[in-house]
């Protein structure tokens, strides 16, 4: 970690602990100025050349993966900032409202993120083959697909908000808070789409640093606005939602303008802006299947959230905090799986099968090391991690969350392998297999969760155990399919 990152962490931690609002705002402002100076000194377009088809395999994947990991960490900070401050400032009901909203937000955003991810696989192949004309045509076609779906999704989520909240068995005392929070967040879905579209585009051509930098600016702004809106202006959960939307808008606008200026080879020309049906069909076959994978995954999580809600506010609050910790914990292997997918896709486009074989071996060893290390840290530190989100006086909530983390945290290697399998099949033009693995994993999780939770002697603990069992079954299916195909780079 360099001196810039250390100073940024110190500024943010100090801001959150400062007793006065003016002091918190001053610290956030200083952190922003520090990062502004960093941006001026860095020529970010030159930090990473983007070619993953040459050089050391392990080093190349790690250099590309690290900014993804840090970027996902910052992405999680959007919601964690809300959760942390809401839980401490507004109380358990507000925490339950924001936490139960998280699953629905992730489900909706996963649809257009899945579209962007699927298009990104095509971008990587074209970039690996050095087909820049085809890449620009694909950018325009994918913008039509992603933009259209996002607008429809935005309208639908606002129209059906109340019925969906009730379908999730949200307790009556929490429902008004959840509705207010979700309404504002869904109004701000378009900036989230714009940011992710350009972030996946730049990652496809091997630049994972630029999206990270704009996310960092956004997170600093998000935390500052959280403090201002909730502590200073007493806006409640509406303030938390407004802070997140405003920060995401800044990230989206900044990344769009920066990409246009600093990546001229990606800028669309008049000849590129045509309705290319073959390109649309190809992108649709990738993006829609990846979208199905992401939406199935998060729909399963949404069903589980509804089951969790039926156990009351204490379990809801514990689950809300523990899921945040969980998402941070397996983030390294998730983002390494995405980096691995881009690595495979570029080399697949370039015809480098020898490099793909060696990359698979390196990825398995690295994922195993990541997962085992994080599992040990989460298992040992579970009580302390829960106390970051929940007041120490809430002993029942902390105990429930610790039980969740002890069960999930013991099996992170299973989801690490699953992320590698998702990325591999997406990169070699088999996104349908990623959908199959998702159905196996989430189907097992949902069915077992409802079955085990219905047993009085098991209760909500059965929900926690259903997750690693689903990971294991999907891993077995994915490896079996790989071993059954002799042409899969062995």
Language-model features and meaning:
Residues 4-7, 20-65, 123-190, 232-288, ...:
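Short alpha-helical transmembrane segments in multi-pass integral membrane proteins
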Residues 63-82, 184, 195, 218, ...:
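Transmembrane helical elements of multi-pass membrane transporters/channels
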Residues 70, 82-86, 98, 123, ...:
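Hydrophobic/aromatic residues within transmembrane alpha-helices of membrane transport systems
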Residues 73, 77-96, 165-172, 228-235, ...:
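Helix-terminus/linker motif at the lipid-water interface of multi-pass membrane proteins
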Residues 92, 96-103, 182, 241, ...:
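Small-residue hotspots at the loop-to-helix junctions and early N-terminal turns
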Residues 95-155, 192-211, 318-382, 415-437:
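Small-residue-rich hydrophobic transmembrane alpha-helices
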Residues 107-110, 222-226, 252-256, 328-331, ...:
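Hydrophobic transmembrane alpha-helices of multi-pass small-molecule transporters
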Residues 116, 184-203, 211-219, 240-255, ...:
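Short runs within selected transmembrane alpha-helices of multi-pass transporters and secretion channels
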């Amino acid at each position: 970690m360099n001196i810039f990152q250390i100073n940024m962490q110190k500024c943010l931690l100090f801001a959150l602990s400062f007793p006065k609002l003016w002091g918190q705002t001053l610290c956030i402002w200083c952190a922003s100025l520090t990062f502004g100076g960093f941006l001026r000194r860095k020529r970010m377009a030159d930090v990473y050349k983007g070619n993953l088809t040459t050089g050391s395999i392990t080093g190349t994947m790690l250099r590309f993966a690290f900014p993804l990991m840090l970027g996902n960490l910052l992405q999680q900070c959007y919601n964690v900032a809300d959760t942390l401050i809401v839980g401490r400032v507004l109380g358990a009901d507000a925490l339950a409202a924001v936490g139960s909203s998280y699953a629905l937000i992730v489900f909706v955003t996963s649809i257009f993120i899945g579209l962007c991810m699927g298009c990104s696989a095509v971008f990587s192949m074209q970039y690996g083959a050095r087909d820049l004309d085809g890449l620009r045509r694909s950018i325009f076609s994918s913008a039509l697909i992603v933009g259209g779906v996002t607008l429809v999704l935005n309208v639908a989520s606002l129209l059906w908000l109340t019925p969906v909240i009730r379908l999730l068995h949200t307790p009556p005392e929490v429902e008004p808070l959840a509705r207010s929070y979700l309404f504002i967040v869904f109004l701000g879905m378009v900036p989230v789409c714009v940011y992710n579209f350009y972030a996946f585009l730049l990652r496809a051509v091997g630049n994972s640093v630029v999206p990270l930098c704009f996310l960092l600016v956004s997170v600093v702004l998000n935390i500052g606005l959280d403090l201002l809106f909730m502590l200073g202006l007493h806006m409640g959960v509406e303030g938390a939602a407004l802070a997140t939307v405003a920060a995401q808008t800044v990230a989206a606008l900044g990344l769009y303008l920066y990409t246009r200026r600093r990546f001229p080879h990606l800028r669309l020309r008049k000849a590129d802006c045509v309705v290319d049906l073959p390109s649309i069909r190809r992108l649709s076959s990738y993006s829609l299947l990846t979208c199905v994978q992401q939406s199935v995954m998060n729909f399963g999580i949404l069903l589980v959230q509804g089951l969790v809600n039926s156990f009351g506010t204490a379990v809801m609050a514990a689950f809300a905090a523990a899921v945040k910790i969980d998402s941070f914990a397996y983030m390294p292997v998730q983002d390494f799986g995405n980096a691995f997918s881009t690595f495979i896709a570029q080399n697949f486009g370039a015809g480098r099968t020898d490099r793909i074989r060696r990359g698979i071996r390196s990825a398995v060893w690295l994922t195993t090391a990541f997962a085992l290390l994080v599992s040990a840290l989460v298992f040992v530190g579970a009580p302390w991690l829960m106390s970051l989100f929940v007041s120490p006086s809430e002993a029942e909530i902390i105990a429930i969350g610790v039980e969740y983390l002890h069960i999930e945290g013991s099996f992170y290697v299973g989801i690490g392998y699953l992320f590698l399998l998702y990325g591999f099949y997406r990169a070699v033009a088999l996104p349908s297999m990623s959908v199959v693995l998702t159905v196996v994993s989430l189907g097992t999780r949902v069915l077992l969760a409802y079955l085990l939770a219905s047993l009085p002697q098991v209760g909500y603990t059965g929900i926690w155990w259903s997750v690693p069992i689903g990971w294991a079954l999907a891993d077995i299916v994915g490896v079996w399919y790989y071993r059954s195909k002799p042409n899969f780079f062995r």
